[in-house]
Amino acid sequence: MNFSRILFFVFACFVALASVSAAPEPRWKVFKKIEKVGRNIRDGVIKAGPAIAVVGQAKALGK
């Protein structure tokens, strides 16, 4: 009997907390920041590609 009351209380708290939203979608901001960091890394690799190729060619000429 006590276990069912505790389970019901926990479930009621979960439902109450899940239905309340204080700010518009605050949990997605963390994922957007991670996505932005990944995008910046990808763009940096794309921009550095030609420079790395030139360094590789220069190293090949030096041998």
From Swiss-Prot:
Compartment annotation: Secreted
Give the record's GO CC terms.
extracellular region
Q: What is this protein called?
A: Hyphancin-3F
Q: Any idea what job this protein has? A: Has antibacterial activity.
| GO BP term (any one) | antibacterial humoral response
Organism name? Hyphantria cunea (Fall webworm moth)
The modified positions for Leucine amide read L61
Q: Which UniProt keywords apply?
A: Amidation, Antibiotic, Antimicrobial, Immunity, Innate immunity, Secreted, Signal
Annotated Pfam families: Cecropin
